[in-house]
Structure formats: structure tokens, C-alpha cells
Curated annotation (Swiss-Prot):
Belongs to the lentiviruses Tat family. Binds to bovine CCNT1/cyclin-T1. It holds the Pfam family Tat. Keywords: Activator, Host nucleus, Host-virus interaction, RNA-binding, Transcription, Transcription regulation. Residues 54-65 are annotated as: Core. GO terms for biological process: positive regulation of viral transcription. A motif (Nuclear localization signal and RNA-binding (TAR)) lies at residues 66-83. The lineage of its organism: Viruses, Riboviria, Pararnavirae, Artverviricota, Revtraviricetes. Also binds to BIV and HIV TAR RNAs. This is Protein Tat. InterPro entries: IV_Tat, Tat_dom_sf.
Length: 114
């Protein structure tokens, strides 16, 4: 029987009931470690396997220095900016691609070369 640092927990079974679920020691003697290898599953039973499983799977705290990778911006992606007021001769240009018909008609109407 472990010392006073251990707590006995009753877990819900995979069938959803609390009756007769597996009993486990949450905070084991850290020198001895858990009795079995930590499972890779993140179900509610495996989260409570040991203190390390609870911190990593249950709370999402990782102490191994790994960080989530961020996606980088694609190389072929371009952003179209509207022309400044001084370039367009005092007229504001619409913020659209120059190949669209509405942009070309607006530019012809106001005397601006697209």
C-alpha cells in the first residue's frame, strides 16, 4: 500500500457507468514510476493513468520544449493594394484586380490607365 501521497480514484468505465470502474493510484511514488507504460490514448481513463499523463493529456501542459508549428504564407500569394490618391490624380481607385471589367470601365471613365 502506498504512503499518504497517493489518492485512490474510481474512473468511469468505457460503458459509461461509474459502477465497478478500474481503480488506479494517481500520484505514485515518483522513484518507482507507474506500474505500466503510459498509453498513447487520450480517453478519460487514460488521461488519469499517472500524474504525467494528467498534466500532458488532461491539461495540455508539455515540458519537453516542443512548440506547435505555425503555417507559413504561400509563395505565390499576392496582395493587390489600391493606388494612392496622388497617383490617380485626386481620384480614388477601387481596390480590385486590374484585369476585372468593372475596374477597367471605372479607369476609362475617370481617365486612368490600368
Amino acid at each position: 500500500m502506498p504512503g499518504p501521497w497517493a489518492t485512490t480514484l474510481t474512473f468511469p468505465g468505457h460503458n459509461g457507468g461509474f459502477g465497478g470502474g478500474p481503480k488506479c493510484w494517481l500520484f505514485w511514488n515518483t522513484c518507482a514510476g507507474p506500474r505500466r507504460v503510459c498509453p498513447k490514448c487520450s480517453c478519460p481513463i487514460c488521461v488519469w493513468h499517472c500524474q504525467l499523463c494528467f498534466l500532458q493529456k488532461g491539461l495540455g501542459i508539455r515540458h519537453d520544449g516542443r512548440r506547435k508549428k505555425r503555417g507559413t504564407r504561400g509563395k505565390g500569394r499576392k496582395i493587390h493594394y489600391a493606388r494612392s490618391i496622388t497617383e490617380s490624380g485626386g481620384q480614388r481607385a477601387p481596390n480590385c484586380a486590374s484585369s476585372s471589367a468593372s475596374c477597367q470601365t471605372w479607369a476609362l471613365k475617370h481617365g486612368i490607365n490600368c
